[in-house]
Swiss-Prot record:
Homodimer. One of its GO terms (cellular component) is cytoplasm. This is Homoserine O-acetyltransferase. Keywords: Acyltransferase, Amino-acid biosynthesis, Cytoplasm, Methionine biosynthesis, Transferase. It is an enzyme of class 2 (transferase). Pathway: Amino-acid biosynthesis; L-methionine biosynthesis via de novo pathway; O-acetyl-L-homoserine from L-homoserine: step 1/1. Gene3D superfamilies: alpha/beta hydrolase. Residues 52-356 form the AB hydrolase-1 domain. Its EC number is 2.3.1.31. Its main location: cytoplasm. It comes from the Bacteria. It comes from Mycobacterium marinum (strain ATCC BAA-535 / M). It is found in: Cytoplasm. The gene is metXA. GO terms for biological process: homoserine metabolic process; methionine biosynthetic process.
Amino acid sequence: MTISDVPTQTLPAEGEVRLVDIGSLRLESGAVIDNVCIALQRWGELSPTRDNVVMVLHALTGDSHVTGPAGPGHSTPGWWDGMVGPGAPIDTNRWCAVATNVLGGCRGSTGPSSLARDGKPWGSRFPLISVRDQVEADMAALAALGITQVAAVVGGSMGGARALEWIVGHPDRVRSALLLAVGARATADQIGTQTTQIAAIKADPNWRNGDYHETGCKPEAGLKVARRFAHLTYRGEIELDSRFANDGQGGEDPADGGRYAIQSYLEHQGDKLLARFDAGSYVILTEALNRHDVGRGRDGIHAALRGCPVPVVVGGITSDRLYPLRLQQELADLLPGCAGLEVVDSIRGHDGFLVESEAVGELIHKTLRLAEDRSSRPW
């Protein structure tokens, strides 16, 4: 599929979820997914010249609902409230913020729980996808709305990987970027923790090789364990110890078989994810993260990054143990459009990019100033 093959559709009303039909999508692997839909939301008005779009790219279990309360089509509040809106870092008086639910997801976009052409869930038939495939799907969704270039791409974690693929793969389509809490490729540590999460899901008897959607039984136990393990990598060690230490949960005594406070906290995180996420999507998206490598097929990471002309802000979190600062330092050193690594001092670990609003907001401001600086120049 090429961009010109996609018919033009209309932008949704502000905050409304719209399913954008992008037709068939040929993946990096050569496989084809038919009848692909991408869930999309926007905030702010599109300028007459269509040059003020800021793409906000979510992390692994996020969705298109960046800001606002829970409501029809989005059962949870916005995952980055305060970052988008009138007077916010992405000021909707100036910018049109657009967010998609990623290809392979489960919040409206085509993924393993979606119905295939035969009317049955894709399940195990859903092909392996890459971060590059996710970017191609996003670009096709934008093109269906008549948008072929964006002012900026902004994302952290998996969203940062998508933003990186945007600027390296399509530098002519974006004026600036913010890369938060991400690296140029998956590390052995990330792959190790993430394949272990996948193994927990697949060890659940209800997984049924991914074909569980019509059985009435989901691999809930496996998904909860995966989320508990993942959440430990998202938070800082000092933060967790200062909050929970080795305390029991409430009146429970661990010495007498009761739960620890940290144990209860992680169980709660697993329960919350069960209410809104599909295990098949968790596996597919985690596998895509494991294969993330911006240098693949581009003569390696050094060549891929050195050849990217897009002005970029790179940010990292001091206590991030999933994507440690050395990974962002590599990006900052090799991307010619980066003026230097921006360090966010936080004890909150990888999730600092979501919760350190003031510091991250300033990085967004810097990114959009770069977009403004290039607005009068040829693309």
